Curated annotation (Swiss-Prot):
Function: Phosphorylation of dTMP to form dTDP in both de novo and salvage pathways of dTTP synthesis.
Gene coding for it: tmk
Pfam family, one: Thymidylate_kin
NCBIfam families reported for this sequence: DTMP_kinase (TIGR00041)
Annotated GO CC locations: cytosol
Residues bound to ATP: G10, P11, E12, G13, A14, G15, K16, S17
Assigned protein family: Belongs to the thymidylate kinase family.
HAMAP family, per database record: Thymidylate_kinase
Organism: Pseudomonas fluorescens (strain Pf0-1)
GO biological process entries: dTDP biosynthetic process; dTTP biosynthetic process; dUDP biosynthetic process
Protein name: Thymidylate kinase
Length: 210
């Protein structure tokens, strides 16, 4: 039995975590096993790598170092959480996955997409999400929401130009593979966003039941 791998992507302040919980609640109400996880992180070791990636420090992190840390955390996450959950038939809802690497390290940092793709294949093999939800909103709204949450992490401290590149990278990936991606207008009030998610539930239930 093979599970269903759904990733939630988008820039800062897009509401991915809140809406991941909402989707999980709806699927569990229908009797579906749901595993909630996130990247970077998802296991104790991967969460320690997350701390290194997000903590503001005086030393400038080399973009290649950042990229390798992201994939190191992902390798552990896949081995310990994602692959076992999918193998037993669960629905995995993951807050960020490799699309964020293409957006942040590729779009934001300007790293080679070919290099990212090579690491993607090395770490993931042929595993790709079954469905990716892109929670999209204007950069200024997302940054205002992130600032309202309190102390900013190392990525949230980046400037508007960085986040415009991140947003554009997400949208380009969705445009290039419309069969896998669904864009959600995350600039709407939460109730409207969740109404958009409600329209996806019947299809998700059908997919999760094979």
């Amino acid at each position: 039995m093979t599970g269903l791998f759904i990733t939630l992507e988008g820039p800062e302040g897009a509401g991915k975590s809140t809406n991941r919980e909402y989707l999980a609640e709806r699927l569990r109400a229908a009797g579906i096993e749901v595993v909630l996880t996130r990247e970077p992180g998802g296991t104790p070791l991967a969460e320690r790598i997350r701390e290194v990636l997000l903590a503001p420090v005086d030393e400038v992190m080399n973009p290649d170092t950042e990229l390798l840390l992201v994939f190191a955390a992902r390798a552990q996450h896949l081995a310990e959480v994602i692959r076992p959950a999918l193998a037993r038939g669960a629905v995995v809802l993951c807050d960020r996955f490799t699309d964020s690497t293409y957006a942040y390290q590729g779009g934001g940092r300007g790293l080679s997409l070919e290099r990212i793709a090579a690491l993607e294949t090395f770490v993931q093999g042929d595993l790709r999400p079954d469905l990716t939800l892109i929670f999209d909103l204007p950069v200024e709204i997302g940054l205002a929401r992130a600032s309202a949450r309190g102390r900013l992490d190392r990525f949230e401290l980046e400037g508007r130009e960085f986040f415009e590149a991140v947003r554009n990278a997400f949208l380009k990936r969705a445009e290039d593979d419309p069969a896998r991606y669904v864009r959600i207008d995350a600039g709407q009030p939460l109730v409207k966003v969740q109404q958009s998610l409600d329209t996806l539930i019947p299809n998700l239930l059908e997919l999760s039941r094979g």
